[in-house]
A protein has these predicted regions:
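Solvent-exposed residues in well-ordered beta-strands and their adjoining turns
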Residues: 10-14, 51-55, 68-71, 81, ...
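Glycine-rich portal/gate segments that line the openings of hydrophobic small-molecule binding cavities
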Residues: 39-81, 137
Length: 152
């Protein structure tokens, strides 16, 4: 099943600070919902394990992420894939763009992914809703981290 998602978030920091935090494994681990481990194996590669629950399906996804087209502090592209065992798989990519706006940084993202296995059988609406909630939670946590205030 194909999935796309776009969005933008206004962050209270410079592009340089936002870019650095987007590449900091400790910040990402703290902000990604369900993230159990996140290891930076090179400046452009991460491996992670995250627990995910979508409807009745729970899974631990193990995956790898690669950063390409790095253009600090303007953005980059992300590609990756994750294996959730019998629950299924996810693979895809995203572009992330950082622009100065209103004394801070506007982060714009565009995600394209393929999902298979039991997760794909749950239906587009449920999967898209869960993906949107996960993205919203990540950016709420990330915005709190960038601004130096604790996440709710």
């Amino acid at each position: 099943m194909a999935m796309t998602m776009t969005g933008e978030v206004q962050l209270p920091a410079t592009r340089e600070v936002v870019f650095a935090k987007l590449n900091d494994p400790e910040v990402l681990k703290a902000c990604i919902p369900g993230c159990e481990t996140l290891v930076m194996s090179s400046p452009t590669e991460f491996s992670a394990v995250a627990a995910v629950k979508i409807g009745p399906v729970k899974a631990r996804f193990k995956g790898n992420v690669h950063l390409t087209d790095l253009d600090p502090p303007n953005g980059y592209k992300i590609s990756g894939e994750g294996d959730g065992g019998v629950a299924g798989f996810a693979k895809g990519g995203a572009s992330v763009t950082l622009t100065e706006k209103d004394g801070g940084t506007l982060l714009t993202y565009n995600v394209e992914a393929q999902i298979g296995g039991k997760l794909a059988q749950l239906g587009q609406r449920l999967v898209n809703g869960a993906a949107k909630k996960t993205a919203d939670d990540f950016f709420k946590n990330f915005a709190a981290n960038v601004s130096g205030t604790p996440a709710a």
